[in-house]
């Protein structure tokens, strides 16, 4: 087995864990490689470009928060991703640093369970598809005279057109990310749905809508001028022109996250969102 290791190099704890992991792997003669930035940060000569990691590795280890895991997922292409949480919240990174070694034992032995998560695929005319595990976001950008109108179609039928600061199209996995901050619902991660969530809409009647994930969503921005950022999992990919159409649908490719069998989704919600903070469970 060969592991690809991606590290949040801005966090000292992640760098410390990376060095400990290297020693652990070396002791067991397990092959590994870092991406270029991670290798440079810890002084390792074993690295490859991120785009090449999937071709040469059997599994990915993410040391950081959800953002680091999202980065790893873009390159994993359905190969298992083990997320160790050294971030702040961590909905996706299921293992704590204390749980890392047991999780690593299970990973290298093949004795692990996984969560298979759907992704979004966004395309522009005559361009290659882009994928996102959490969400596709289109923002108002440089349209300054008045809020732009976002025109949304489902399977080529108009759903609506409304003025807002932007729009989030999220998977069930991504429902606890930007969509939640914008007022969207929490959706159980294995639900076969997407949620379309407006960002600060001009009208109070504009609300998030949950749709089946077999729908094709088309979004364009009705504005006389401006450029509108298109982001995939928070990373800007394009600046859209007025009227340019983004087609969003379920990707044929999945992400496989190594599961923590000691934690249920209900427990994750309780702990991350402090749902039992005011009234502890059982009291």
From Swiss-Prot:
Active site per UniProt: 66 (proton acceptor)
Binding locations of NAD(+): 66-67, 134-135, 145, 163, 165, 176-181
GO molecular function: ATP binding; metal ion binding; NAD binding; NAD+ kinase activity
Classification via Pfam families: NAD_kinase (PF01513), NAD_kinase_C (PF20143)
Coiled-coil segments on the chain, per record: none
Tagged with keyword NAD: yes
Gene Ontology terms: biological process: NAD metabolic process; NADP biosynthetic process
Top-level division of the source organism's lineage: Bacteria
One term under GO cellular component: cytoplasm
Main subcellular location of this protein, as a coarse class: cytoplasm
EC number(s) per entry: 2.7.1.23
Family to which this protein belongs: Belongs to the NAD kinase family.
Function: Involved in the regulation of the intracellular balance of NAD and NADP, and is a key enzyme in the biosynthesis of NADP. Catalyzes specifically the phosphorylation on 2'-hydroxyl of the adenosine moiety of NAD to yield NADP.
Protein name (record): NAD kinase
Organism of this sequence: Chlorobaculum parvum (strain DSM 263 / NCIMB 8327) (Chlorobium vibrioforme subsp. thiosulfatophilum)
């Amino acid at each position: 087995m060969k592991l690809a290791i991606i590290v949040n190099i801005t966090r000292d704890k992640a760098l410390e864990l990376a060095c400990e992991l290297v020693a652990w792997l070396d002791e067991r003669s397990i092959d590994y490689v870092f991406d270029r930035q991670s290798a440079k940060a810890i002084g390792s000569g074993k690295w490859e470009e991120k785009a090449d990691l999937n071709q040469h590795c059997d599994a990915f280890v993410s040391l950081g928060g959800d953002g680091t895991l999202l980065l790893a997922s873009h390159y994993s292409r359905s190969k298992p991703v083990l997320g160790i949480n050294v971030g702040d919240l961590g909905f996706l990174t299921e293992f704590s640093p204390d749980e890392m070694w047991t999780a690593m034992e299970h990973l290298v032995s093949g004795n692990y369970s996984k969560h298979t998560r759907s992704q979004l695929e966004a395309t522009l005319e005559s361009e290659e598809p882009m994928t996102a595990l959490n969400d596709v976001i289109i923002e108002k950008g440089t349209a300054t005279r008045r809020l732009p109108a976002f025109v949304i179609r489902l399977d080529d039928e108009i759903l609506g057109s409304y003025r807002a600061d932007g729009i989030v199209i999220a998977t069930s996995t991504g429902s606890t990310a930007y969509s939640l901050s914008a007022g969207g619902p929490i959706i159980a991660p294995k639900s076969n749905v997407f949620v379309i969530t407006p960002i600060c809409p001009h009208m109070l009647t504009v609300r998030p809508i949950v749709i089946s994930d077999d729908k094709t969503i088309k979004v364009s921005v009705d504005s006389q001028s401006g450029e509108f950022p298109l982001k995939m999992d928070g990373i800007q990919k394009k600046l859209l022109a007025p009227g340019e159409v983004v087609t969003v649908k379920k990707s044929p490719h999945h992400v496989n996250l190594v599961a923590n069998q000691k934690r249920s989704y209900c427990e994750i919600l309780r702990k991350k969102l402090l749902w039992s903070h005011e009234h502890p469970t059982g009291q």
